[in-house]
Amino acid sequence: MRPPPDPQARRRATHGRGLSAEALALLALMLKGYRPLARRFAASGGEIDLIVRRGRTIAFVEVKARATLEAAAIAIDGRKRARMSRAARAWLARHRLPADAILRADAVFVAPRRWPLHLPNAFEI
């Protein structure tokens, strides 16, 4: 019989999987022509996994890694969207953008042995 899992070890493994998923998501976005502006931006009340730009579009990206793409999509709930919106407002307050900039909230879903699925305009900022 195996001993119960160590909570800290489990947390470290989950964190590592999240970092790997974010790196894979960033690679997928860069191959689509996006340029990274920030990774793991944190402000009081929220965090954004990736902030990327392509042309006039600035995308605030939530990355979710789960066993299936469907499970990843379900993982972005209203509370997570609100936290991301607060962080996006904090980032925007610190950066000057052109008047014609297009802002949106995207999602990238990552599942084992699947290419990341990018959903532009996944939810309101």
Swiss-Prot record:
Belongs to the UPF0102 family. Gene3D superfamilies: 3.40.1350.10. This is UPF0102 protein Mpop_0474. One of its GO terms (molecular function) is nucleic acid binding. SUPFAM superfamilies: Restriction endonuclease-like.
